[in-house]
């Protein structure tokens, strides 16, 4: 699938068009997520048991840049426990700058995640987005995508 998406971008969209993204498959029997990170700059796992966040980036490559992406595809996996959260976002979140020229960055994003772990996944994403908008005090200069997955069952 990753190779087909890469080929489509490379050969059907305007030259110089690139995409970042995460491809994931969830094994509900094993509570495991298998994923390929294609250049998403912020991919985090919140561990409820330890109340901490760690980056689980992977070694992916931006889509549409090379003809053959297969050498760059690395499947990673992470086991999820009840209350654990996967959170990913594009560079539009991290790199957006305030009026003073300060980027929102990973620290502010992680703080927003930790402060809102009790919310449903959809509300976590919108709360992080609203924190970004409040920080910027202006319109966004870049596109923003946020993905949140929360493990609810044992």
Task: Show which residues each predicted segment covers.
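Conserved subregion of the PPM/PP2C metallophosphatase catalytic domain
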Residues: 1-154
């Amino acid at each position: 699938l990753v190779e087909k998406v890469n080929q489509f971008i490379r050969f059907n969209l305007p030259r110089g068009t690139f995409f970042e993204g995460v491809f994931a498959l969830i094994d509900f029997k094993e509570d495991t997520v298998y994923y390929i990170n294609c250049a998403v700059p912020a991919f985090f796992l919140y561990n409820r048991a330890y109340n901490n966040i760690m980056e689980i980036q992977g070694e992916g490559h931006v889509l549409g840049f090379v003809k053959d992406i297969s050498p760059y595809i690395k499947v990673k996996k992470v086991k999820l426990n009840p209350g654990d959260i996967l959170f990913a976002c594009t560079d539009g979140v991290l790199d957006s700058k305030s009026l003073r020229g300060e980027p929102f960055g990973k620290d502010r994003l992680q703080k927003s995640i930790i402060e809102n772990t009790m919310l449903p996944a959809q509300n976590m994403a919108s709360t992080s987005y609203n924190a970004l908008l409040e920080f910027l005090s202006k319109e966004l200069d870049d596109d923003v995508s946020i993905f949140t997955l929360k493990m609810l069952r044992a």
